[in-house]
Design a protein with these regions (language model features):
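Cleavable N-terminal export/targeting peptides
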Residues: 1-111
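Outer-membrane beta-barrel proteins
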Residues: 80-84, 105-111, 145-147, 179-184, ...
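Eukaryote-specific, low-hydrophobicity, charge-rich regions
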Residues: 92-176, 185, 189
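Short, surface-exposed coil-to-beta transition loops
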Residues: 135-136, 209, 238-240
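Outer-membrane beta-barrel translocator/channel fold
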Residues: 155-176, 181, 192-205, 230-279
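Short, conserved, surface-exposed binding loops centered on an aromatic residue
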Residues: 184-185, 202-204, 214-218
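Short helix-loop boundary/capping segments
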Residues: 208-226
């Protein structure tokens, strides 16, 4: 008897908690972090530069400049690569993964591949499911004018249902990014993205974003994809992580995976089911 009574109570309580996540995210992103504008207390140190400190800074400027320049070239190599010595950076786009039964997003250069069309458009859609009270949709488009750079847009619409109060909450998350694949091999590619994250509804705020992503073409017709994007909106983290496996069939695929969104303090976890096509 007690068990039969507790189960409905726990179900209603869990549904209410999930429905409060979106509202909590909205409230936090609207208000942001409190800014400490008070003057320093007498016991707090105040940063002041003495003349000797200024002279030491001037003396060390030359050494510091050397390390800054050195760090710049290291960063340039790590992020962009060496086009004089890394042949894979010239690998052309494939028409779609596994078009020849073995190649992923990029194929090795030969006399025929150089002449092939480089333009490609990737479109995919995924249903997001956490429970009966929390679900959503993730639409992603990737425009590849050539093998060097691409433009990517992600649109997530999240829904939460409060069965106790019979109300619904929704949140629209947009990510706009410029992408670059640093490593471009037949079976593996790794790259980064730079762009902006925007949350609509009654928040209407945006922030700078950066991310990493990779594709592994493990064996015939199957690949694995992972992507992470970090951003801040109104001083609070708005991050996304996704991992999914894809089964490819000609120029389309079916997928299953997992997504996590961290927006403010709430964290959202979803199983994903979807499909995509390459044009």
């Amino acid at each position: 008897m007690l068990k039969n009574t507790l189960l409905p109570i726990l179900f209603i309580f869990s549904s209410t908690i999930y429905a409060q996540k979106i509202d909590k995210t909205k409230d936090e992103l609207k208000s942001g972090k409190p800014v400490d504008t008070r003057p320093p207390l007498p016991t707090e140190p105040v940063n002041q530069s003495s003349p000797s400190t200024v002279r030491e800074s001037n003396d060390s400027f030359g050494i510091g400049g050397f390390f800054v320049e050195f760090g710049f070239y290291i960063t340039l190599y790590a992020g962009i690569g060496d086009y004089r010595n890394e042949d894979h950076l010239y690998y052309p786009l494939s028409p779609y993964p596994y078009f020849d039964g073995k190649t992923g997003n990029y194929e090795k250069i030969d006399d025929e591949s150089v002449l092939k069309k480089q333009l490609r458009f990737d479109l995919e859609n995924h249903f997001l499911y956490s429970n009966n009270a929390s679900f959503g949709n993730h639409l992603k488009g990737k425009f590849r004018p050539f093998q060097y750079l691409y433009l990517q847009t992600d649109y997530r619409e999240l829904m939460e249902r409060d069965k106790f109060s019979k109300t619904n909450s929704n949140l629209s998350l947009f990510q706009f990014n410029l992408g670059y694949d640093r490593l471009r091999f037949e079976k593996f590619n790794l790259g980064w993205t730079l762009g902006a994250t925007y949350i609509a509804n009654d928040i209407n705020k945006a922030g700078f974003s950066y991310g990493l992503n990779t594709d592994v073409f493990a064996f015939k017709k199957v690949s694995f994809n992972s992507a992470m994007i970090w951003s801040k909106i109104n001083g609070l983290s708005v991050n996304s992580f996704e991992f999914r496996g894809k089964y490819h069939k000609k120029n389309h695929f079916f997928s299953m995976g997992y997504e996590n969104l961290k927006m403010g303090s709430p964290s959202y976890n979803y199983a994903t089911f979807g499909a995509g096509i390459y044009f």
